[in-house]
Amino acid sequence: MSTTIIGFPRLGEFRELKFTTEKYFRKEISADELLAAAKELRAKHWNIVKEKGISEIPSNDFSHYDNVLDAAFLFNVVPSSVRGLELTDLERYFALARGYQGEKGDVRALPMKKWFNTNYHYIVPKFEKETQVKLAGHKIFEEFAEAKELGLVTRPVVVGPFTLLQVSDFEDGVAPADFVDALATAYQEVFAKLAELGAKRIQLDEPSLVKDLSAEEKALFLDLYKKLLADKKGLEVLIQTYFGDVRDIYSDLVQLPVDAIGLDFVEGKKTLELVKGGFPADKTLYAGIVNGKNIWRNNYEKSLAVLEQIPAENIVLTSSCSLLHVPFTTANEEFEPAILNHFAFAVEKLDEIRDLDAIRNGQGAEALAANKELFATERVGENAELRARIAGLTDADYTRLPAFAEREAIQEEAFKLPALPTTTIGSFPQTKEVRAKRLAFRKGELSAEDYDKFLAEQIDEWIKWQEEVGFDVLVHGEFERNDMVEYFGQNLSGYLFSKNGWVQSYGMRGVKPPIIWGDVTRLNPITVKWSSYAQSRTEKPVKGMLTGPVTILNWSFPREDISIKDSTLQIALAIKDEVLDLEAAGVKIIQIDEAALREKLPLRRSDWYEDYLDWAIPAFRLVHSTVAPDTQIHTHMCYSEFTDIIPAIDNMDADVISFEASRSNLEILDELKAKNFQTEVGPGVYDIHSPRVPNEGEIDHTIEAILAKVPSKKVWINPDCGLKTRGIPETKASLVRLVEAAKAARQHLK
């Protein structure tokens, strides 16, 4: 038996890649300096994996922004709008991810979507009529050669052709089948070049195989691989799957002339059953047995019990998915040992994979004994009062009265807002000064009184600016918050916070998910102080800003000893108490963000309701069910595909919902219209994840497109998402255009 991982975190132990790349974006360092720093980081990571005793080391799992974008770039899947710009390869690459606005042109970034059921976001490739698929990139070869210079023969990794097609957009009437032959040829060219460089095996990531597959999709997969595998150019091929099981394609998959197949034994409900039914003796099974998505220690006894049932002769132990979904290492954390011993970040998961391999080979008795002792000890007690409160919930606790239509009329009279009311999603730019003041306060270098004074000044400044520009519903800006989940978690029992537990979310943005350690209750009011202060500074309504229970759960590392449903209901009751306190303090518009609602939606449609939506949607309703009819409840969702769960979203019974929409070309509007969506909506009118400022007239056209699909009385005008990560100049310029466009659109309604 040997060991490997599917992939390793990219940002670095201390987010070195993030800070270096941001310097490049600010033109503080050259492209050569960025590339040199990235090369140094890769070498460091390979060395860590090697020193941990992992026998097969992957390469090309590193990315300057996103691995799906890397694959698109490798195969020349670059939209004509970007291909025509006179830019360097690196500039063109980042233009696809971030947009480009300069002397050489003005192009929007490609859309961004959640990567399956994770909080990682990928850039969506675009296939057009003009797309000529061919081998165009060189990153995969350069990184293999780099590792070889260090004495390492790595296993190159690239997104497989089926998944590349499945996660892409197609325009101009083209379809995935149109690119099968060209993709097969291009992948074979990759095989040939890697074999020439000395590679032995390539990993083709095909997570799309774990979803529901139609007959057409199965045929596409088999056609691709029949052509692709007709000539492997002397290279061994591993088809690697993750995030679930491959029940729809298993019988075909095991008959393909591949050398190895990677299966997920953590999230794959039927993986063990499939393998026990037979696995080819001439293939190697890469068994994903260590959870790549959560931070809890692996229970060796349970993992070994699974491994003992696998009939395959040739097994490589691996992670269930890439380790980019967990933090780098626990070595920099300050938890007491009794807590820290329960956690395994990426580096520690290497130890776990090696331990399991050693135990299987009769050499890991000490590691097994220590692991047994860890799991034999009760980790945390339960809150009996909270458990009783949840047990006592009835249907009435999940139902808001009066019904939506009656509330809508009451709120229209209460707020007297103009047509197409304008607002933002919540946060304003967090400047260096804001971050420095927060850090100084945390370190005790700034008094609470001085910090509060600073925050009040920030709120005053932005409330005044919003009034001057002409916004209808204001926000306080969230200057007191570092992260929309961590901020709440710090005021909830049962939560722990890592010091350096950063995980890549999109591009160079990292998030630091808190850890749900025990039962969750609210310790004290969380947002009332600054929301009520902001409301006192203006006659216009100011939104109270909360993070919803499902998003708090999905953006945390959840417990594994109780169900995520039970954890979510605990959080929902805590946020419900906060909602009622805000309402009592005079805050009459309350936004409860559910940005991550889609994130843990099962990948198979048959599991959507029973396993998730049947409790996730009621958990949201529980939060706001007892507010007064003249209190308006907003929610916000971003960067996921929502079109197929529109009825469930309407069933959340919010009064207003804002969606990410501009970057995905307002695709959601047709579905809202088709499903007769009742909730008032704010489809984002410009993309905040790109630094470019919308052109004059751009937002006007977007509003026009929205009004063609949604009745004007149902429409709100807002950006795609919060503005925390943007700069002040671009933010103000964009928001001024937003308000001007809304005012112009109102004139056309008259």
Curated annotation (Swiss-Prot):
Summary of the function given for this chain in its UniProt record:
Catalyzes the transfer of a methyl group from 5-methyltetrahydrofolate to homocysteine resulting in methionine formation.
Q: Where is the active site?
A: 689
Tell me what this protein is called.
5-methyltetrahydropteroyltriglutamate--homocysteine methyltransferase
Please tell me where Zn(2+) binds in this chain: 636, 638, 660, 721
Q: Which transformation does this protein catalyse, written as a reaction?
A: 5-methyltetrahydropteroyltri-L-glutamate + L-homocysteine = tetrahydropteroyltri-L-glutamate + L-methionine
Q: Which annotated residues bind L-methionine?
A: 425-427, 478, 593
Q: Where on the tree of life does the source sit, at the highest rank?
A: Bacteria
Q: Gene encoding it?
A: metE
A GO molecular function held by the record: 5-methyltetrahydropteroyltriglutamate-homocysteine S-methyltransferase activity
Cross-referenced InterPro entries? Cbl-indep_Met_Synth_N, Cobalamin-indep_Met_synthase, Met_Synth_C/arc, UROD/MetE-like_sf
